[in-house]
């Protein structure tokens, strides 16, 4: 399928299906729409009136057009209130159009939607991402896939002019999102710690990245007792992956760290019935997004040096598993009383944060499916953002808005660290039930000295049980697009 920008407008374009977007209560047939309605033999007005189309968010219609017109089908999508129009709304509109076109077996599609911030290039990129993400099909594990081959061969973005650069950029970003989606969607017998190394190796070889993989012995030499404590029970060897994109003259040096638990049984504090243990293949969502971001950024080639870090292992049960009550020593010398083996992700991140800071980076972002408490607080669509550095937090919020992904900044309430204090170690790995996502962030903060750092809890948005905007049911690839936009923003 080819996506391209064009100077043709809805008034001049010819093809199988024309898609139009309307804001809520702005569906009057006036001006250019009058000419378009005449061109379509009155179908536009008739469709809006008969179906009571008001342009509300999520509203969509499709209709055949008279055989004498240059358009065979007409697709209408509602964009909601104009005051709430943003990148997410635009991308979701493109996704809705793409799915309708697929269902109608359209071959050539013309898309006419409002521009984002009067910027044709930005608009073309958002539309491209929305279309490609909506049409992505992951049928790897089906013997007889229900989704049939997509008939769509050409999508033209109307009125935006030639936008090959913006479209190409979006396609590269989407390739990273799809890598993350497919890693998270795959079961734990398909994506193991060793699979992480294989994927990182392929990225390094394909895009000229530097790769360092530390095994058990190397991690022991660095004193990574927190990471290795989690890894003890698994028969699969731990893999500490350090992938580097290094341009010739970087203006910034950053680290992105993803929690990479390829399966989380809970350890000896095993996840019981009704806990969703069968979904714990996605506990490596942060690591999948980290490698997805690496794939996109390596193709986009910004002048920013980035270190991608994944401490990959499983949290399993065996005779060698860490016990509740064990004391682990992290690589910065701090001791941790393990009062819950099911709070293991923060232990792996602790050593990864220490490792990243020693690289001399200027900012660190970690992302993790860390706490159910964050889902309770923010639901399934919004990720939590914690940072003691407001400048970094603001950069990430701007990037998320541009990417069409949602984050909400949460408090770093230092008083809550009282709940993590241990009588026999420097800290416990979990605190009281209340404020659990905040105490998790405060725990991670103990492994950062001075470097600007942000923590993203992505436990909710990494997966969706049903179609949601640009995402189909399953893994979303969140927040690859935010990470990429953050890096690109610093490269400007």
Curated annotation (Swiss-Prot):
Residues annotated as transmembrane: none
Catalytic activity reported: Release of an N-terminal amino acid, Xaa-|-Yaa-, in which Xaa is preferably Leu, but may be other amino acids including Pro although not Arg or Lys, and Yaa may be Pro. Amino acid amides and methyl esters are also readily hydrolyzed, but rates on arylamides are exceedingly low; Release of an N-terminal amino acid, preferentially leucine, but not glutamic or aspartic acids
Entry-linked Pfam families: Peptidase_M17, Peptidase_M17_N
GO aspect biological process, one term: proteolysis
Subcellular location: Cytoplasm
One GO CC annotation: cytoplasm
Active-site residue list: 271, 346
Residues binding Mn(2+) 2: 259, 264, 283, 344
Enzyme Commission identifier(s): 3.4.11.1, 3.4.11.10
EC main group: hydrolase
Tree of life domain: Bacteria
Note on how the cofactor is bound: Binds 2 manganese ions per subunit.
GO molecular function, one term: manganese ion binding
Keywords: Aminopeptidase, Cytoplasm, Hydrolase, Manganese, Metal-binding, Protease
Presence of keyword Magnesium: no
Positions with a binding annotation for Mn(2+) 1: 264, 342, 344
Cofactor: Mn(2+)
Keyword Cytoplasm carried by entry: yes
Family: Belongs to the peptidase M17 family.
The protein's role, per its UniProt record: Presumably involved in the processing and regular turnover of intracellular proteins. Catalyzes the removal of unsubstituted N-terminal amino acids from various peptides.
NCBIfam families assigned to the protein according to its UniProt record, in alphabetical order: PRK00913.2-3
Descriptive protein name: Probable cytosol aminopeptidase
Organism expressing this protein natively: Synechocystis sp. (strain ATCC 27184 / PCC 6803 / Kazusa)
Gene from which this protein is expressed: pepA
